[in-house]
Amino acid sequence: VASKNGNEIALLDSDGQMKKFSVSYPIVDLEVAKQGVIALILHGDNGNYIELYDAAQKKLVSIKVTSDQNGYPMDIDLSSDGQNLLVSYLVVDGINVKSRVALYNFGQEGEDSGDQMIGGFDFKDTVIPKVSFMGDSKAVAIGDDQMIFFKVGKTISKKQTISFDKDVSSVAVNDDYAAFVFEDQKKTDQEKYEAVVYNKTGRKLMSHKFSSEYNKLLLGEKELLLAGNYHCSIVNFAGHEMFKKDFKKRIVNISPTGKRQKYLITYENSTNLSEIY
């Protein structure tokens, strides 16, 4: 747990024990691997830093990245084994804008490269605000008009690109699926939104059109949850709405538990573990 632009980090283990430590610069982004390795992007005085810490708060790696050389970091994701870090950069050169997706390795391949970077790609005239691993051997980069799938190994290679013809409103990604809500600006009432789910090979699994306003998109166990301030619905991967409910209390947050139809719902003054069906 860390506050954006702060310097303090609190790491909770499975037993509820908390460890706290501080870093030198304000935190821009943070990711944690399953075994407790922490990857950070820090905002320094003359550039940004990518730093890696183990579960005992020992600094493993510190890499300085500057806007002139690399661009501005937009998003990061750490592989579950803590060995690979995926970074999306926004590169501005005069009036030209491009995105750069870079893969860093903290094992032998990264050491051999000199700067830990083992591969990357540039994408012209697009902004990529989200990158995510889908397991340790595959990854996805999501831009404002496209989605790019990668294979990750000793380097990174492009496998497939899917272009979008509608505005991306929301994104959710896990190890197996990438879910989107697209907004059709031409429609103002019925079926303004379209929820779409892809698997990690890029195959479209389902499409579901809806009109109700929402502010949160979640991927559950082969189901999609769409939540607004006072309502939520669950759509299965066949595109059928299985559940729809209005709540009396305002929903602040909903989090999946990893079990089908079970979600942790946070209201303004309470939190409940609920089975939604």
Where are these regions (language model features)?
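Repeated scaffold domains used in trafficking and secretory/extracellular systems
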Residues: 1, 25-36, 69-78, 118-134, ...
